[in-house]
């Protein structure tokens, strides 16, 4: 374990003592450090009446148990304080470490010892993570140090888990959204599932907008998958025109109806553990799936602002600007009189994407979004540079396939019977609008691009994203982060994992950072907590995070690609083509081992390089036919230890999100030996070489010169590392699989790689 502590708010001794006493710690009148520490430990071991036994089970140093130390005439030193602190945090002397000084340095132990201000040291210790991934104070609360009294208790600017999760209110309401997404002449009602603790005060909300949460239709999804075995189209040269457009909203009727309590409850929901963490700390949890999902009205419009409006309506209801009904009969209203109107949104992938969209509406009441692995432009999710480009691991998926998956109204046979004809009519329109024939940008995709509306964001923004995420690729967060106005407080956690959550990792106090932030923004707690702009996981060292100011730089380092000319063939034998088409992973294995149709260029580095942003390939090439595509990957090549892209379990169910509530595993990205690591990649249609809004002709055997931007990255390379560039045509994981006979010819002398260098 290595500490990367960003959530602790520096606290002086006087404030620290007051906070400790408010929790129930008792201290002697004496200001002697040793007596203060003993009093702290007496309270810490609250579950046992035999304090001496508990204290004697610790050691003060490798020759003295802790009880003997307290009985002896020896002062409390930094070494003894550190030794005891480590044991409280779950480290075992003699097994986890043998040399105290070396170990505290190795793990970057963050707690300072100050014998003249021991209250500050103890306070910091309680605000430090246990080996099990929980703050020491949270570990104490988990064991019952403070009972669940449904009252806010704060420590170091964070709310504690003192809300009773065994007596939660679980209710369902139907919020009226000012849209008619299926054109049935009625405003759409949206099902909202609410979990909230009992409280005498109005409380804030953590909302997850998840089109998956009411169920998914995998059978319909699989039937809708598109074949990737198709020719690359030859497109006529033309310019593409799009316009920013706003959706039409309805004026909802203000009917004279009674106001009542909700009349529908539920027993279980597949919750998100970060939400559970906040639920036990006094935040309501809301799960909503939006239009076109089970028990809601409308059509699944998939990614546009009509869908976003169905989630925005929930925030409006929480602030008294929209109506909610007890049922689809629309006979009685329900008020959110328990809500203080302040909302944060959470969730990964599609869920985080809805957070992005919501933020760009500027809706009042949305204070923070925590958008993890989120899409900012749906075109960049299903297309790239004029090409069909399936998200990593899902060849054949497209937006209409996602519609089939998430239109969970189809899971209710009676509802689907009534909606089927209209649904397929709208779905067919969607399938035409996505234009798989050309792969080009169009108005449909522009309506699902949140970047032009980033200027409207007013809430605080938190992103997390994996630099090995080839599902929702890094460009999604890169573009959104850099598009936000300067007035917006924004933060980005960049890790080296794939499409994964990171809130339960040992190396970073993510949950605690979010706790401090939401206390500021949703509960109005004044604190000095400041989250850095960017927290980046260093790829060269295990469990090391560091703060940065920007993602992307204008500084560049140019690497010429070589001398002479090189050819890349597109066509494979029928046997090889079929094998790659059936299993794209076999293609990737052959590509990385030099067995595919490819050009491989290696560049040993004679200096350290810190990549930060978009690598650009400047290419001079010809195609033997009047079309073509090019794919590229940038690799850190060579056998060495690197961070894996999937977190492994360090310990099972040790992280308690409340008081024995919603336990989850402690995880971390492992450092393992590998032969290569993909730093970046990209694909491009030669007819779209100068941007998305222009389709150009390609003349056979005529030279083209263009810049090819790869996915952005933040990656550290060291002197002696080998940077590898792979150039090829068809990518069997992402692009259409065209096995026609053509080749690309590259002028290496006129081509180069431009690296963004911090």
UniProtKB/Swiss-Prot annotation:
Reaction catalysed by this enzyme: Hydrolyzes Xaa-Pro-|- bonds to release unblocked, N-terminal dipeptides from substrates including Ala-Pro-|-p-nitroanilide and (sequentially) Tyr-Pro-|-Phe-Pro-|-Gly-Pro-|-Ile
Compartments (UniProt record): Cytoplasm
EC primary class: hydrolase
Membrane-spanning residues: none
InterPro entries, per the entry: AB_hydrolase_fold (IPR029058), Galactose-bd-like_sf (IPR008979), Pept_S15_Xpro (IPR008252), PepX_N_dom (IPR015251), PepX_N_dom_sf (IPR036313), Xaa-Pro-like_dom (IPR000383), Xaa-Pro_dipept_C (IPR013736), Xaa-Pro_dipeptidyl-ppase/CocE (IPR050585)
Its biological purpose: Removes N-terminal dipeptides sequentially from polypeptides having unsubstituted N-termini provided that the penultimate residue is proline.
EC number annotated for this UniProt entry: 3.4.14.11
Protein family per UniProt: Belongs to the peptidase S15 family.
Gene: pepX
Matching NCBIfam families: PRK05371.1-4
HAMAP family: Aminopeptidase_S15
Pfam families hit by this protein: Peptidase_S15 (PF02129), PepX_C (PF08530), PepX_N (PF09168)
Protein name: Xaa-Pro dipeptidyl-peptidase
Quaternary structure annotation from Swiss-Prot or TrEMBL: Homodimer.
GO cellular component term, pick one: cytoplasm
Active site (catalytic residues): 349 (charge relay system), 469 (charge relay system), 499 (charge relay system)
């Amino acid at each position: 374990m290595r500490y990367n502590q960003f959530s602790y708010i520096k606290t002086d001794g006087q404030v620290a003592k007051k906070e400790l006493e408010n929790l129930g710690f008792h201290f002697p009148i004496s200001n002697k450090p040793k007596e203060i520490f003993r009093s702290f430990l007496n309270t810490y071991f609250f579950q046992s009446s035999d304090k001496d036994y508990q204290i004697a089970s610790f050691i003060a140093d490798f020759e003295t148990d802790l009880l003997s130390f307290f009985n002896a005439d020896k002062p409390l030193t930094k070494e003894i304080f550190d030794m005891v602190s480590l044991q409280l945090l779950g480290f075992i002397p003699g097994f986890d470490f043998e040399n105290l000084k070396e170990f505290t340095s190795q793990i970057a132990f963050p707690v300072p010892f100050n014998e003249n201000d021991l209250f500050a040291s103890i306070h910091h210790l309680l605000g430090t993570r246990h080996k099990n991934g929980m703050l020491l104070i949270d570990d104490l609360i988990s064991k019952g140090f403070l009972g669940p009294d449904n009252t806010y208790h704060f420590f170091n600017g964070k709310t504690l888990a003192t809300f009773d999760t065994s007596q939660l209110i679980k209710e369902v309401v139907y919020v009226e959204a000012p849209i008619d997404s299926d054109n049935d002449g009625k405003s759409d009602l949206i099902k909202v599932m609410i979990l909230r603790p009992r409280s005498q005060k109005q409380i804030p909300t953590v909302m997850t907008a998840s089109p998956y949460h009411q169920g998914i239709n995998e059978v319909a999804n699989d039937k809708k998958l598109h074949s990737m075995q198709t020719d690359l189209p030859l497109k006529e040269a033309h310019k593409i025109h799009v316009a920013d457009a706003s959706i039409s909203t309805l004026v909802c009727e203000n009917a004279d109806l009674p106001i009542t309590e909700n009349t529908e409850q539920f027993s279980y929901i597949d919750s998100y553990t970060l939400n559970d963490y906040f639920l036990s700390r006094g935040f309501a949890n809301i799960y909503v799936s939006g239009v076109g999902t089970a028990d809601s009205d409308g059509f699944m419009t998939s990614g546009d602002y009509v869908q976003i409006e169905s989630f925005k309506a929930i925030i409006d209801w929480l602030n008294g600007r929209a109506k909610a009904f007890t049922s689809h009969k629309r006979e009685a209203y329900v008020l959110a009189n328990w809500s203080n109107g302040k909302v944060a949104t959470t969730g990964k992938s599609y869920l985080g994407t809805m957070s992005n969209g919501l933020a760009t509406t500027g809706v009042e009441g949305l204070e923070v979004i925590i958008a993890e692995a989120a899409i900012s432009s749906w075109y960049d999710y299903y297309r790239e540079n004029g090409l069909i480009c399936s998200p990593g691991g899902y060849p054949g998926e497209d937006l209409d396939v996602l519609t089939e998956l998430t239109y969970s109204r189809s899971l209710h046979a009676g509802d689907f019977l009534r909606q089927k004809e209209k649904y397929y009519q709208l779905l067919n329109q969607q399938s035409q609008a996505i234009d798989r024939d050309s792969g080009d940008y169009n108005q449909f995709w522009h309506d699902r691009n949140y970047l032009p509306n980033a200027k409207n964001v007013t809430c605080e923004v938190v992103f997390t994203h994996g630099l090995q995420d080839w599902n929702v690729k890094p460009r999604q967060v890169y573009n959104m982060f850099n598009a936000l106005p300067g007035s917006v407080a924004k933060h980005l956690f960049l890790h080296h994992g794939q499409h994964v959550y990171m809130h339960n990792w040992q190396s970073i106090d993510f949950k605690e950072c979010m706790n401090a932030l939401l206390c500021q923004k949703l509960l109005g707690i004044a604190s000095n907590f400041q989250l850095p702009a960017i927290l980046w996981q260093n790829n060269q060292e295990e469990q090391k995070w560091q703060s940065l100011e920007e993602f992307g730089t204008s500084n560049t380092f140019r690497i010429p690609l070589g001398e002479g000319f090189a050819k890349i063939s597109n066509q494979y034998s029928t046997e090889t083509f079929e094998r790659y088409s059936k299993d794209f992973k076999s293609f990737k294995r052959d590509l990385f081992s030099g067995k595919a149709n490819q050009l491989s260029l290696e560049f040993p580095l004679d200096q350290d390089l810190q990549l930060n942003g978009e690598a650009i390939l400047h290419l001079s090439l010809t195609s033997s036919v009047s079309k073509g595509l090019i794919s590229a990957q940038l690799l850190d090549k060579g056998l060495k230890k690197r961070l894996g892209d999937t977190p492994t379990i360090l310990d099972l169910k040790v992280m308690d999100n409340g008081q024995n509530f919603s336990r989850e595993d402690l995880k971390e990205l492992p450092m393992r030996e590998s032969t290569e690591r993909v730093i970046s990649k990209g694909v491009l249609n030669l007819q779209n070489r100068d941007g998305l809004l222009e389709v150009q002709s390609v003349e056979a055997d005529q030279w083209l010169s263009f810049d090819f931007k790869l996915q952005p990255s933040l990656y550290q390379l060291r002197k002696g590392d080998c940077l590898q560039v792979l150039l090829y045509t068809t990518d069997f994981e992402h692009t259409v699989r065209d096995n026609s006979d053509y080749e690309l010819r590259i002028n290496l002398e006129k081509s180069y790689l431009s690296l963004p260098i911090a």
